[in-house]
């Protein structure tokens, strides 16, 4: 088996805030050259030096939404053409602070979307898998998603191909 020691890796966090049967979704339309351009995702971002998953998600959610929260749910591994990304996935149903409204977020436009409508938005195919796992209230899971460009090639849940 070929070693992947030269493949870049990064750690990220992603959080889905839940309220009244809806997720707070971020429509990524503000940054040029964004891997998530025009897609709808939860809020989060890349780890800064010496951050834990919780540190990262707390900081990113506070920066993008103005609120403070935490609740760890699982880890998702993305294998992209020349990058491996470990995304630490969170959900939250309670927070403190004042929520940033609409397009005041520098990353895109924040909008509450009913859960049953999220899969109809332009989202990554793999996101549909882990959003289903979140809805099933799985306490912890390991999901590996392999992409070629924007196309999902393989999904492995808890070590088993889906």
Residue ranges and their predicted role:
Residues 2-25, 46:
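Conserved N-terminal beta-strand and adjoining loop/helix that marks the start
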Residues 3, 74-80:
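Short, solvent-exposed loop/turn elements at beta->coil junctions and helix N-caps
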Residues 21-22, 31-32, 48, 92-98, ...:
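Short, charged/polar surface micro-motifs in flexible loops or helix N-caps
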Residues 23-59, 63, 77, 155-162:
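Conserved Nudix-box catalytic region and its N-terminal flanking loop in Nudix hydrolases
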Residues 66-75:
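A short coil-to-beta-strand element that immediately follows conserved catalytic motifs
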Residues 78-100, 111-112, 127-128, 132-139:
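Active-site-adjacent beta-strand/loop module that shapes the phosphate/pyrophosphate-binding cleft
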Residues 100-133, 151-161:
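NUDIX/MutT-family hydrolases
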Residues 134-154:
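Short, active-site-adjacent segments that bind or coordinate small-molecule cofactors and metal centers
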């Amino acid at each position: 088996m070929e070693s992947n020691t030269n493949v870049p890796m990064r750690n990220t966090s992603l959080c889905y805030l839940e309220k009244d049967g809806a997720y707070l979704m971020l429509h990524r339309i503000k940054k040029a050259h964004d891997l998530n351009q025009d897609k709808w995702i939860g809020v989060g971002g890349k780890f800064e030096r010496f951050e834990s998953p919780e540190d990262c998600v707390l900081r990113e959610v506070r920066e993008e939404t103005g609120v403070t929260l935490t609740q760890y749910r699982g880890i998702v591994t993305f294998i992209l053409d020349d990058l491996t990304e470990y995304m630490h996935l969170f959900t939250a149903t309670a927070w403190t602070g004042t929520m940033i409204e609409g397009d005041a977020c520098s990353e895109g436009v924040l909008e509450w979307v009913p859960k049953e409508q999220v899969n109809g938005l332009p989202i990554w195919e793999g996101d549909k898998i882990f959003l289903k796992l979140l809805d099933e209230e799985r306490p912890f899971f390991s999901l590996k998603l392999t992409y070629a460009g924007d196309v999902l090639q393989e999904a492995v849940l808890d070590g088993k191909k889906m």
